[in-house]
């Protein structure tokens, strides 16, 4: 809030709108149960914004604050000559995966954790069901989307908050990729009810048509290119060094 207030005051004082870019998350969504999630399929930005976690609540809260400071700050939009307000823009990211950093225990990290374990010849117990499905994205695409939204002309934007998507796959899809890449990988499914409940509250996929239309969003990495050209080559490099020093 402090940063938003500062940006809003500077926009008004210097009569030039400050761009404020915020990384939001699919955690801002909240589906009531698995049946509703599966029926909903691909979800738009304004649908099912009822998060089940404190993390998701805070992401949604920041989105709403950004909208307020961009449009209604102090109700000054009602003035005869409204001041210049800040230019808030947010991206709702899916599960982000980097080939260069280790997964750190996030709720969507079961996929990369599985592959890191398989590459090292370690057993892995996945904490969600095999059929669990959500959207994921390669880190280079996440960076690309941030830069694209930052550079987009304000006149082309129809929203303050945009979904961006790349590919949606199941935990079983990750397991199959791990087994194919590292034969003999030992992966089981041991469900953690609380973590499963969180992932079940997130949509299977997100609709990013608005971003594609408004500012030309398109990911570089589909599911095959993500694994074959980005993630697996770097994982192999990382663990080929184990024990070599």
Model-derived segments and spans:
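Conserved active-site helix of classical SDR/Rossmann-fold NAD(P)-dependent CH-OH oxidoreductases
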Residues: 2-3, 60-67, 71, 111-112, ...
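Active-site Tyr-X1-5-Lys
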Residues: 31-35, 50-89, 118-120
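Glycine/proline-rich active-site loop of Rossmann-fold NAD(P)-dependent oxidoreductases
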Residues: 60, 84, 96-112, 139-140, ...
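Conserved sequence/active-site signature of Rossmann-fold short-chain dehydrogenase/reductase
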Residues: 26-29, 96-98, 142, 169
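Hydrophobic structural elements of the Rossmann-like NAD(P)H-binding subdomain
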Residues: 21-23, 80, 91
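C-terminal substrate-binding subdomain of Rossmann-fold SDR/epimerase-dehydratase oxidoreductases
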Residues: 122, 127-129, 135-245
């Amino acid at each position: 809030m402090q940063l938003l207030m500062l940006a809003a005051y500077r926009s008004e004082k210097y009569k030039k709108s400050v761009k404020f870019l915020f990384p939001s998350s699919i955690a801002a969504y909240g589906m009531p149960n698995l049946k509703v999630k599966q029926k909903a399929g691909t979800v738009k930005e304004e649908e099912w914004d009822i998060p089940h976690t404190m993390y998701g609540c805070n992401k949604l809260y920041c989105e709403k604050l950004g909208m307020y400071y961009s449009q209604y700050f102090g109700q000054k939009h009602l003035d005869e000559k409204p001041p210049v307000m800040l230019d808030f823009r947010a991206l709702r990211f899916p599960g982000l995966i980097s080939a260069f950093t280790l997964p750190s225990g996030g709720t969507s990290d079961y996929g990369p954790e599985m592959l890191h374990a398989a590459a090292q010849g370690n057993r892995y117990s996945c904490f969600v069901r095999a059929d669990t499905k959500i959207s994921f994205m390669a880190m280079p695409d996440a960076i690309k989307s941030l830069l694209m939204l930052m550079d987009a002309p304000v006149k082309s934007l129809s929203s303050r908050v945009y979904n961006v998507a790349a590919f949606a796959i199941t935990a079983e899809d990750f397991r199959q990729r791990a087994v194919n890449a590292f034969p003999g990988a030992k992966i089981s499914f041991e469900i953690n009810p609380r973590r499963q409940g969180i992932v079940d509250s997130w949509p299977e996929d997100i609709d990013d048509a608005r971003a594609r239309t408004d500012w030309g969003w398109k990911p570089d990495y589909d599911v095959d290119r993500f694994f074959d050209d980005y993630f697996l080559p770097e994982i192999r490099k990382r663990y080929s060094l184990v024990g070599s020093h």
